[in-house]
Regions:
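HIT superfamily nucleotide-processing domains
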Residues: 1-143
Length: 143
């Protein structure tokens, strides 16, 4: 069954959006729930659910589009910085299941806060996880 995708309908023009960037592979449009003024979403035109379905070509095109949109936002809105945010899966707060990157201009003293408290990790645990990621050891599983 074909599931309706809002972002695909923006790509094909059947849903209205405030498009700010358009090339052969990607589209960027204003987020209707902006965290800050100028908050855009950058998407591949081809439907891809998340980063795990994203191929190398789409990944390269999306990052190039992010860079282009970031330069436009930087030049025209003059933010102090820009965050690129990508959520993959419901547990990571993905709400639209078409791969997208939030491009969020930062102006200082805005309402977007980093909700995590940063502290140094356990060096042994960090080293152990790195070994797992490099394929040097297996994830310990209960027997």
């Amino acid at each position: 069954p074909v599931v309706h995708c809002l972002f695909c309908s923006i790509v094909d023009g059947s849903s209205a959006s405030n498009i700010v960037y358009d090339d052969d592979h990607c589209l960027a449009f204003m987020d209707i729930l902006p965290m800050t003024p100028g908050h855009c979403l950058v998407i591949p035109k081809r439907h891809v659910r998340d980063i795990f379905e994203l191929d190398d070509d789409d990944a390269a095109h999306v990052m190039q589009a992010c860079r282009s949109v970031a330069n436009i936002v930087h030049d025209r809105l003059e933010p102090l910085g820009i965050n690129l945010v990508n959520n993959n899966g419901a547990a990571a707060d993905q709400s639209q299941f078409h791969f997208h990157i939030h491009l969020i201009p930062r102006y200082g003293r805005d309402r977007l806060l980093h909700p995590w408290e940063r502290s140094y990790g356990n060096p042994d645990q960090i080293r152990s996880i790195a070994e797992i990621l490099r394929g040097e050891r297996e994830i310990p599983r209960p027997e």
